Regions:
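Helical hairpin unit composed of two closely spaced alpha helices linked by a short loop
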Residues: 3-4
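Charged helix-capping and loop-helix junction motifs
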Residues: 7-10, 105
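His/Asp/Glu-enriched, well-ordered alpha-helical/loop segment
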Residues: 11-95, 109-113
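Active-site microenvironment of metallo-dependent hydrolases
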Residues: 65-154
Length: 154
């Protein structure tokens, strides 16, 4: 959307039997890399394009961001099941966007942002706990230094 390069036709892709998945586009054309945000953008843009509130429902979009994406790349993940990779996010339900508890999936797709993610577990390893990544100070310092070098070249 930022580059105004067109709008994806969700319904046509479904009719054609295309497996729909979600991903982030990369920082060069989509300054953020949040799958939570991408779920909302995918759901709302599909509804706007089709002029139908029943297109790209929350459960479908959540699946596009999880199990469908993993399956498309042949990764044994995307759902919690015996024999699958132990990948999970722990969500902080005490965030304002998560208060309405009629549908956790709906809240994640339409109301949440990445700040609701408390803990990230990938292949059984805790990568982020209580919103802290080991070594994040050094990672941020390196990022700031790299950004400063890029700005200096302009």
């Amino acid at each position: 959307m930022k580059l105004c390069s067109g709008q994806f036709d969700h319904e046509a892709a479904q009719r054609a039997g295309i497996r729909l998945t979600l991903g982030t586009d990369g920082a060069s054309s989509n300054n953020g890399l949040s799958m939570v945000t991408e779920m909302k953008v995918a759901a709302l843009s599909a509804k706007i394009r089709s002029l139908s509130p029943t297109v790209a429902r929350d459960q479908e979009v959540f699946g596009m961001a999880t199990a469908a994406g993993a399956a498309a790349f042949g990764i044994d993940a995307g759902e919690i099941a015996v024999g699958r990779l132990a990948d999970a996010l722990l969500i902080d339900l005490d965030q304002p966007s998560m208060v309405a508890d009629h549908s956790l999936v709906s809240n994640l797709v339409y109301a949440a942002d990445s700040s609701v993610i408390n803990t990230v577990i990938c292949d059984g390893r805790v990568l982020m706990r209580d919103r802290y990544v080991d070594g994040q100070e050094e990672i941020l310092a390196q990022g700031r230094a790299a950004a400063a070098r890029v700005r200096a070249r302009r």
